[in-house]
């Protein structure tokens, strides 16, 4: 598992799973196609949590006379690796087709305006600069049978020293853990809906 390769030891973890009535290939394709912006629209609580977390950063930009970065019209999991750090960007730690994808982030998440560190995948596991937390989200598919798939989302966070551990624990116990759970559950639910949606019939040959 990519999770164990990059973060075998961690402070907190959360996991979500949902059963999808579709095969692994269809479910994986849906996971890669799901629009994260659309998840916020389909699941209002997910959208509200995202907007709430982004608010301090927006205010900070405005106070400095800067325009906040424009929100993308659409955003898929692989797109996160192309975004700048601090503007929604994540590090793609690894992807195994039709199996799992893992994304990582390093920062002081407990601050109203998060201080990020841009840490490449090959340095992610060893990163130990004091005062930071490292988070991984891993999403995976596992066959149940030929026509159904278990879709999973697992989050792990590790801190780099005692001070960061204390700060992160306070942040986590304020309800951030529940919020993270809701966000991933929303992503999995919309992925399931996409995977289970009937395939439109191919147009037949023209006649006449």
Model-derived features: positions:
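Beta-strand/loop substructures that line and gate deep hydrophobic ligand-binding cavities in soluble
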Residues: 122-178
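Short, solvent-exposed loop/turn segments at secondary-structure junctions
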Residues: 25, 36, 107-110, 156-158
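Hydrophobic ligand-binding cavity/cleft-lining segments
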Residues: 1-90
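Intrinsic-disorder/low-complexity, polar/charged segments enriched in Ser/Thr/Lys/Arg/Asp/Glu/Gln
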Residues: 11-19, 100, 134-136, 148-152
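A conserved amphipathic terminal alpha-helix motif
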Residues: 167-203
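Acidic, Ser/Thr-rich low-complexity intrinsically disordered segments
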Residues: 204-208
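Hydrophobic-ligand binding "helix-grip"
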Residues: 82-146
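A short, polar/proline- and glycine-enriched secondary-structure boundary/capping micro-motif
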Residues: 39-40, 112-116, 162-166
